[in-house]
Design a protein with these regions (language model features):
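Positively charged n-region of N-terminal signal peptides that target proteins for export
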Residues: 1-4
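Bacterial N-terminal signal peptides
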Residues: 8-16
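Active-site-adjacent betaalpha module
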Residues: 21-28, 32-35, 62-65, 87-197
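Active-site loop/turn elements of alpha/beta-hydrolase fold enzymes
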Residues: 41, 79-80, 163
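Short acidic, Gly/Ser-rich segments with clustered Asp/Glu that frequently serve as metal-coordination loops
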Residues: 42-48
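Short, solvent-exposed loop/turn segments at secondary-structure boundaries
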Residues: 48-52, 86-89
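…and closely analogous acidic/polar surface helices at protein-protein or active-site interfaces
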Residues: 49-67
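Von Willebrand factor
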Residues: 66-83
Length: 197
């Protein structure tokens, strides 16, 4: 019986060696190619946001500066809605003049919370060559969250940026930042400045 046990142990080891060897094979890591998604910081929606929106706007502008300085795309996303009267060409549709976007930044318009749903956002991102997305804007509990999920479903690495997302309730925003592991500005800066462009 002892010989049979030893034989079975040796046989099990021999059989499992190829599977262990296969598990050790490393896939080459894809280089980080970041893009910033600035979501829905439109004049019609900002008055409904919590008072921490002023701090968030500072972070959003700092992120725009960081991405632009390092040659990475800033993609602006706009929500259009008949219900809320947010139509292209109206003041409510536009971003505040204090936001450092440029007319040359790619622009995507959406009618659903998820920026990927029935839009050309995926095509726009692919055209920039980006594979890693950093999200800022509003609402943390609405369009930012839905677009983060859409990015995950579209096989992008996606991160919300802490203090650069806002909602109508600051506590809800903090909960989203915690639940979805929002990254800090300093972490984004570290990634951007070391991503090899």
């Amino acid at each position: 019986m002892k010989k049979l046990t030893i034989f079975m142990a040796i046989l099990l080891m021999v059989i499992s060696i190829p599977s262990f060897a296969q598990d050790k094979t490393e896939k080459p890591k894809e280089a980080i190619k970041p893009a910033l998604l600035v979501i829905d910081i439109q004049n019609a929606f900002l008055p409904r946001m919590s008072p921490d929106k002023e701090i968030a706007m500072e972070y959003i502008n700092a992120l725009i500066d960081l991405f632009r300085k390092n040659g990475y795309p800033v993609i602006r996303i706009y929500h259009t809605s008949e219900e809320y009267g947010v139509k292209p060409g109206t003041e409510g549709f536009e971003y505040p003049e204090t936001v450092k976007i440029l007319p040359t930044d790619p622009k995507v318009m959406k009618t659903y919370a998820d920026g990927f749903n029935k839009t050309d956002l995926d095509r726009v991102i692919k055209a920039t060559g980006s594979n890693t997305l950093f999200l800022c804007g509003l609402s943390a509990v609405g369009c930012v969250l839905a677009t983060w999920i859409g990015a995950q479903n579209s096989d992008y690495k996606a991160f919300m940026v802490k203090n650069a997302i806002i909602s109508h309730n600051a506590e809800y925003t903090k909960n989203v930042e915690q639940m979805f592991d929002a990254v800090t500005y300093d972490m984004v800066q570290l990634i951007i400045e070391n991503s090899g462009k």
